């Protein structure tokens, strides 16, 4: 698939033709994206950097200052200022979120919140990471919300550190079009189009289309990729009490699979950041995803309403890759494994919520009673060579490409089916102007069937396992509004996550269980222009899978881990012209029990200290009127580079980015972004010493934005 920036440019110019936009006002009079704080909705746009409402923490439209739990919101404006194509960059400003395995650069397969790694993230409250979905594209995202602490009482299976929920762009009442085209270092080209229009005079029928086209060679040798995204959405106000929203997204992604660089003898920095250890003639991995989502809302009366929503996604991934396997004793001979993957998955989720808003005497209750059903199918085929038999080696100092492909010696075929049902109960309680509480519980029933066929050394081995797990995950929280500017809160909650597979006796493993405790303060500063949340936390997780010392080759649920610390996040307007967003986290995360890893070992990719700050200044006078300029600083401390307590570490780093925008006309803006200004050599993440992802060198992006 070869995609061209001219495709979206052509569509954008066509959509801006006088015939199509004959009914619009002049561009100078259209201020369509300005949204006041009073009009903000939990799923809508945010003015500036500070969000006031969220639905991620309660599945209801609630003021953030009334939620007795830490939640960070990174709004669309941050993504626009950074000119970021992926949402991972936004997570740097959430506080306590770090990067983990990205599956060769293809996905947001895993990330880390408050010390614990998770593969769960959500899209409008639906699980979005079943299978191997492409890394989320920023073109469709209105805001990125990070709920800190266990979220199983709302979302079901997950990890105790926290959860990311992506809120997508919805059709708006105003008519507008935004065309954005950028070009940058390493022949990186990207164009997006955001087109919104009412379809009738009354504004009951609204339509929005988001398009993105991307073509990039990247700073890594031979590791280029292309992406095409089409995301239409449609809303219909059927009557004053009933609305329907339908959203779809189609993504076509082709990218070279890249496990990154290596660390000879556990030392980094001796190799060029650009050096690639795969094979240029392997081709690209194709990852095609389709998502369809529909939400029907109906107000029964002034107190009660219904929400029925369904979400379906499908994905297919296939392609060849030569991947880093292990380093020989000499430290420069890299054994490699040649793989072919063919994965396909389907996931469907349906939710039915009954929401109530009523009083018992002087006490207000916002009630949520919800049912959820999910069915998931996943089929995986992996063919791989065997490095111990065919090393397929390459010299990391002077790589010579074009070796004959080794034969496949192992054939893995896996089939997984999951049926999950859940009941949610929640009560948001407003006792008076000072005190608020939150009670919630979720009852989950999870059934998993797995079948695996493995051909190894010419012999087939078939295995199957089945497990049914039930879990009740409660949550309780309280908030005291000491003054209009200061709110104190505390909460406790539980999480669970099923463990796949069976032990030596063929018995399904007990699920991982997590507990979280949090206390903090929420501040409303500078007459409401700046919001801040400071929270301390203590998290535990048990039933972590670890090797069974009595039965080599098998596992048992004997592992435990603990994470504790505090994090800070703030955002808003320091002055009318200066917007800020920033975060800091101190995280002490370690293994507390394991059969193979020493107690006290640090958890993978978790820095003890991390922080970020971005500020943008808007000019209001003179020849710079309408322009802005800003900078972003990101610090990440030392991290364990693998999970085996080998002593391999990723060094700390600090990066500085610059940005500026200048209005060429009333509807045209020129932008420039310089990332990693001082060209620091750094490493974003690793899995071990042969899977290490280097960060981007200094790079420049120029952009042009047209608004109609």
Curated annotation (Swiss-Prot):
Q: Where in the cell is it found?
A: Cell outer membrane
Residue ranges of the TBDR plug domain?
A: 63-169
Kindly list the GO molecular function terms attached to this UniProt entry: siderophore uptake transmembrane transporter activity; signaling receptor activity
Q: What is its main location?
A: membrane
A biological-process GO annotation = zinc ion transport
Which Gene3D superfamilies does its entry note? TonB-dependent receptor, beta-barrel domain (2.40.170.20), TonB-dependent receptor, plug domain (2.170.130.10)
Q: Name one Pfam family in it.
A: Plug
Ordered alphabetically, the record's keywords are: Cell outer membrane, Ion transport, Membrane, Nickel, Nickel transport, Receptor, Signal, TonB box, Transmembrane, Transmembrane beta strand, Transport, Zinc, Zinc transport
Give the way it sits in the membrane: Multi-pass membrane protein
| Source species, domain of life | Bacteria
The family database entries (SUPFAM superfamilies) matched by this protein are listed as: Porins
Q: Where is the signal peptide?
A: 1-21
| Ion transport as UniProt keyword | yes
Q: What is the stated purpose of this protein?
A: Transports the metallophore pseudopaline, which is involved in the acquisition of nickel and zinc, and thus enables bacterial growth inside the host, where metal access is limited. Is probably involved in the import of pseudopaline-metal complexes.
Q: What is this protein called?
A: Metal-pseudopaline receptor CntO
The protein's organism comes out as Pseudomonas aeruginosa (strain UCBPP-PA14)
Query: Gene of origin?
Result: cntO
């Amino acid at each position: 698939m070869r995609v061209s920036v001219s495709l979206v440019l052509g569509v954008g110019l066509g959509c801006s033709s006088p015939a199509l936009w004959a009914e619009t006002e002049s561009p100078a009079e259209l201020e369509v994206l300005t949204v006041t704080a009073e009009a903000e909705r939990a799923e809508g746009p945010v003015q500036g950097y500070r969000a006031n409402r969220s639905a991620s923490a309660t599945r209801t439209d609630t003021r953030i200052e009334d939620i007795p739990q830490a939640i960070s919101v990174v709004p669309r404006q941050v993504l626009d200022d950074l000119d970021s194509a992926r949402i991972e960059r936004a997570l740097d400003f959430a506080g306590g979120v770090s990067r983990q395995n990205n599956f060769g650069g293809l996905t947001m397969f895993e990330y880390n919140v408050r010390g614990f790694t998770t593969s769960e993230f959500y899209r409008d409250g639906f699980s979005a990471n079943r299978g191997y979905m492409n890394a989320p594209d920023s073109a469709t995202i209105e805001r990125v919300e990070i709920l800190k602490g266990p979220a199983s009482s709302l979302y079901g299976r997950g990890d105790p550190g926290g959860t990311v929920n992506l809120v997508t762009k919805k059709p708006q009442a105003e008519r507008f079009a935004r065309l954005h085209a950028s070009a940058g270092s390493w022949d990186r080209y990207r164009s997006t189009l955001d087109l919104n229009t009412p379809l009738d005079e009354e504004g009951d029928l609204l339509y929005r289309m988001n398009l993105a086209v991307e073509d990039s060679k990247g700073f890594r040798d031979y590791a280029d990729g292309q992406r095409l995204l089409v995301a239409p959405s449609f809303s219909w106000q059927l009557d004053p009490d009933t609305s329907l929203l339908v959203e779809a997204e189609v993504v076509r992604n082709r990218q070279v699979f890249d496990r990154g660089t290596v660390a000879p003898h556990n030392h980094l920095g001796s190799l060029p950041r650009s050096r690639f250890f795969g094979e240029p003639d392997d081709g690209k991995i194709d990852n095609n995803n389709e998502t369809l989502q529909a939400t029907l809302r109906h107000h029964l009366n002034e107190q009660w309403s219904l929400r029925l929503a369904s979400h379906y996604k499908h994905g297919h991934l296939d392609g060849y890759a030569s991947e880093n396997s292990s380093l020989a004793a000499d430290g420069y001979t890299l054994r490699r494994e040649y793989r072919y993957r063919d994965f396909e998955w389907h996931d469907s989720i349906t939710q039915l919520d009954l929401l109530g808003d009523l009083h018992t005497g002087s006490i207000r209750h916002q009630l949520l009673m919800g049912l959820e059903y999910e069915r998931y199918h996943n089929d995986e085929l992996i063919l791989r060579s065997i490095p111990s038999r065919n090393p397929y080696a390459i010299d990391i100092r002077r790589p010579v490409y074009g070796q004959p492909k080794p034969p496949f010696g192992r054939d893995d075929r896996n089939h997984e089916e999951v049926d999950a049902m859940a009941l949610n109960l929640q009560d948001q309680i407003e006792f008076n102007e000072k005190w608020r509480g939150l009670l919630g519980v979720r009852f989950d029933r999870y059934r998993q069937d797995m079948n695996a066929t493995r051909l190894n050394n010419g012999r087939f081995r078939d295995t199957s396992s089945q497990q049914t797990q039930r879990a009740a995950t409660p949550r309780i929280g309280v908030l005291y509004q000491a003054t209009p500017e200061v709110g104190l809160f505390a909460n406790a909650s539980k999480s669970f996550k099923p463990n796949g597979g069976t032990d030596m006796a063929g018995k399904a493993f007990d699920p991982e269980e997590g507990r979280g405790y949090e206390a903090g303060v929420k501040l409303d500063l500078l007459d409401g222009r700046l919001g801040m949340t400071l929270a301390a936390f203590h998290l535990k997780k048990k039933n972590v899978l670890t090797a069974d010392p009595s039965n080599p080759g098998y596992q048992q649920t004997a592992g435990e881990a603990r994470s504790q610390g505090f994090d800070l996040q703030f955002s808003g307007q320091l002055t009318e012209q200066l917007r800020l967003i920033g975060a800091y986290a101190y995280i002490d995360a370690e293994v507390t029990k394991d059969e193979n890893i020493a107690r006290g070992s640090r958890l993978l990719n978790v820095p003890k200290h991390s922080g970020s700050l971005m500020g943008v200044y808007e000019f209001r006078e003179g020849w710079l009127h309408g322009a802005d300029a800003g900078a972003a600083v990101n610090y990440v401390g030392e991290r364990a580079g693998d999970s085996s307590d080998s002593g391999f570490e990723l060094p700390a780093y600090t990066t500085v980015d610059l940005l500026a925008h200048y209005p060429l006309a009333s509807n045209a803006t020129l932008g420039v972004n310089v990332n990693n200004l001082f060209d620091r050599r750094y490493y974003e993440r690793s899995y071990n010493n042969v899977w290490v992802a280097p960060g981007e060198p200094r790079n420049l992006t120029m952009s042009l934005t047209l608004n109609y």
